Amino acid sequence: IILISDIHFGRYNSSEEWQESMSKYFYEWFIPLVKRELAKNPDAVLCCLGDVYQDRNAINIDVNNLVIDIFEELASIIPCYILNGNHDLSKSSNKGNSSLRSLSNINNLTLIRDTTMLQFVEGRKNVAKVIAVPYLGECALENKKLVEFSTKADFAFMHTEISKMKFDNGMTIVGAVDAEKFAGRVISGHIHRRQETDKVVYIGSPYHLDRGDIGDVKGIYTLDLTTKELSFTPNDFSPIFTRVPVKEFMEMDDAT
């Protein structure tokens, strides 16, 4: 399973510069990666763990068309699953309208708005079960889903805040989803900085989105369903935010 999350199309008021950067990432780096993974494993699938769009109130037409084009291309080569993230919803729960409806008519693409059990097959053999829990807006509801499916699935895919992990600002998350309620491993979107423990993996955004990403190596996770192991491929393509000391900046010449 190829995992991606928090791609946030429409960032910075639908900036054309950001659209171009994101478009290049998908067409020149990510889609070629997907094709390489498919060459190794024809049964591979793609799961996006939420926040395809940035703005929950209004979506720029050019941004929407770009997103549709990209996912039409992806779905033409690999089965795609997309969970609702909080930025994809009109309300702070999963009861409102979803901007992902724009993608609902794409063949080979499944939108996950309600908790769904996914069963994956490789070589005609059932190798893994995943409980997909989209953003529900209430940690208590998400905890109930983890308890309900605790021993029924190998992994939980989510878009949520998880206790004992970190917000992007470094503060510890408290009073949120309790990953210990689930017997398997929890893999989630929502937090943009990558984090890994034995129990939880925040896969993070695939590219830098703001200065809060300074120092965070972005990339793509791939989940091997046979070994149940995650591997990480760094994104060495996209621009990054960085800090430059004032003295060093002042000494830069025009060619730097």
Residue spans for each PLM region:
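Extreme N-terminal starter segment of soluble prokaryotic enzymes
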Residues: I1-I2
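Active-site glycine-centered loops adjacent to acidic/histidine catalytic or metal-binding residues
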Residues: D6, G50-D51, G85-N86, H159, ...
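Core catalytic region of metal-dependent phosphoesterases/phosphodiesterases
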Residues: I7, N13-F120, A179, A183
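Short active-site segment of divalent metal-dependent hydrolases/proteases
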Residues: F9, Q54, I162, R193
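Conserved catalytic scaffold of divalent metal-dependent phosphoesterases
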Residues: V67, D88-V177, P206
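Binuclear metal-dependent phosphoesterase catalytic core
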Residues: L118-G123, I203-T256
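Conserved beta-sheet core of the metallophosphoesterase superfamily
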Residues: K166-E229
